[in-house]
Amino acid sequence: MAIDLQKLTLRRLLDTQSNDLYSKLLNQYFTGINQTLFGKVRSFYKAHLRLPSTEEILCLRKDVGLQEYIENQIITEENYNDTIADEFLVAQLQDFYIR
């Protein structure tokens, strides 16, 4: 089973609402709809608002396509792994971006 580090990182960010993790991430580390989702997360931080919990995001129902993506692709057991350190995730995303 392959781990999608972008999805795993987004799940970790939504679950933990970690400012420390967010501060280490760049928009360029993500591609496709993952980049769109990270942009939504970034908009909360830019407005100095608290990042909503995963449950709150799912209740908003503003962007149905993005909501379905979060439910079906991000909030899955495959994208949950609390043994991988945040620093490792960031380093791997950074390495992928550089290449």
PLM features: what roles do these ranges have?
Residues M1-F96:
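Noncatalytic partner-interaction/assembly domains of nucleic-acid and motor enzyme complexes
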